[in-house]
Amino acid sequence: MKTHERAANLALAGLSLAPLVVKVNPNANVILTACLAVYVGCYRSVKPTPPAETMSKEHAMRFPLVGSAMLLSLFLLFKFLSKDLVNTVLTAYFFILGIAALCATLLPSIKRFLPKEWNDNAIVWRAPLFHSLSVEFTRSQVVASIPGFFFCIWYAAKKHWLANNVLGISFCIQGIEMLSLGSFKTGAILLSGLFFYDIFWVFFTPVMVSVAKSFDAPIKLLFPTGDAARPFSMLGLGDIVIPGIFVALALRFDVSRGIKNRYFNSAFLGYTVGLTVTIIVMNWFQAAQPALLYIVPGVIGFVAVHCLWNGEVKPLLEYNESKAEEEEACEEDTDSKQNKKKE
């Protein structure tokens, strides 16, 4: 982990804890926390191989429709079923997800302090009655899951804003780290679709705001305001993860070309500007705003202007992580065959 990455992790942890001891401006807290989560997730996504999950253009086109169906389903569940019952089921679901997400987030930091065999030697556990079902894990993962277990217990019991945010930030970092858009074309399709999705569900229906207020699970970050009438400002995790995976793609594009953070800086600046404009407009009108309405033009616009200015539209549009992975695999096979012939 590089110095700037370590500094970002420490800053994110400190900012999360700060409202416990001092009054933090909620607007500044929203912007700084979201930007730090994106920054950390982006750098964690830079690995020898591309992220495990890559989105296709077809998936990107369908995503707003699937998201709309899920959002409407949740709205109807809260409307026709007991709110407490729905949230109890969701809490149990997110309890398991929270342990896994926080474990994966903490693991790289914890591994450095544990014996090598704890990191390398896997333990296989098989279900007593169903031997075909097995789980593989290391001792390091067990150690890393302990904080996640206690945070999930705390969240389930108290629904404290800090426990909510720790789990929510973990989901954001893991989402940005593990998901890949594959190409900038796919990213543009996804962000454009969600741009209209966010506008429709926030401005033209009460569904988005109603679900956000009723959904008592770590799908949003909460920022204390000190105002009894409105105790928390909120930011949905989707407003961090969705643009975040586009910013992460820009960073990996820079790394693949051996250049230092040129397009990453543009995308990250676009995200910061877009989120800042969201907060300004929200406070001006004193009403909920679809964050992607401002973030999407910021992220795509800054990257587009940058590549047009540099005359690099073609390499940016042709970049595809899955093809890059295949080319690397072919090169490795060729090298291994040549080495065998020499032997």
Swiss-Prot record:
One of its GO terms (biological process) is membrane protein proteolysis. Pfam families: Peptidase_A22B. One of its GO terms (molecular function) is aspartic endopeptidase activity, intramembrane cleaving. Ubiquitous. It is found in: Endoplasmic reticulum membrane. Residues 324-343 are annotated as: Disordered. Coiled coil: none annotated. Keywords: Endoplasmic reticulum, Hydrolase, Membrane, Transmembrane, Transmembrane helix. Its EC number is 3.4.23.-. Intramembrane-cleaving aspartic protease (I-CLiP) that cleaves type II membrane signal peptides in the hydrophobic plane of the membrane. Catalyzes intramembrane proteolysis of some signal peptides after they have been cleaved from a preprotein, resulting in the release of the fragment from the ER membrane into the cytoplasm. This is Signal peptide peptidase 2. It comes from Oryza sativa subsp. japonica (Rice). The lineage of its organism: Eukaryota, Viridiplantae, Streptophyta, Embryophyta, Tracheophyta. The gene is SPP2.
